[in-house]
Amino acid sequence: MPEKSEIIKLSAYLVIISYVVCVICIGIAIAKSPWFSFPYNWLSELGNSNEGNTPVVDGILVCHVFNAGLMLGGLGGMAFSYGMYLSNIFKGKKGMLAIALFFLAMVFIFLTGFFSQDYGILHTISAFSFFFLVPLSLLAISLSTPGWTKLALRIVSVASLLAFVLLFVDRPWGSNSIVEFVPAIALGVGIILIVRMILSPNRVSATQPASQDRESN
């Protein structure tokens, strides 16, 4: 059975890879959708099979590329939440709350891709839940982190929360998808900070079983 530290490392690599893949899928969907406009379109429209006669890339509908990217990102994030649980950083009620909020955020980004915009209200609920949970989870995670990492997480969580509020405000200048990108970027920054923290040598060694320590002595 894999050691705890190895599972933590694997979950960290998975979340980074899945996040990058998700961003690439979104980028492909944008690049291959000439009708898409940052000021006026929502990102979710890229996942709508009826939007702008969705183009085909190598035999695959662009909407499926977009939705698959969201689902892969969510799966990687869910795996990472288990790695967070195994680490010795998030303890007590605050720590468990932080992990639970992060896990739920990842569940809802998965559901945002699973229930594409074609599904109407199911997609809307999933997407808005994700945008709401991202700042909450990052803020909760900051309560279990020290120093500048705490400050950085709080800054990106506040930025993400402001973006969430803007989703409900009439914006004559448009920028629909740009507002959506803020929590996505905040999540990416948060993931990097958390991965850096749980993969630090001291943290990883702290997760080694006590029996191994005794054997080494």
Features from the language model and the residues they span:
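Cytoplasmic juxtamembrane regions at transmembrane-helix boundaries
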Residues: 79-105
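Transmembrane alpha-helical segments in integral membrane proteins
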Residues: 14-17, 70-89
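Membrane-proximal helix-loop-helix units in multi-pass membrane proteins
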Residues: 101-142
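Membrane-interfacial loop-to-transmembrane-helix junctions in polytopic alpha-helical membrane proteins
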Residues: 3-14, 55-65, 90-97, 115-126, ...
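Interfacial/capping segments of alpha-helical transmembrane domains
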Residues: 31-44
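N-terminal signal-anchor transmembrane alpha helix
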Residues: 6-34
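Terminal transmembrane helical module of multi-pass membrane proteins
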Residues: 139-217
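Interfacial helix-start motif at the membrane-water boundary
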Residues: 48-75
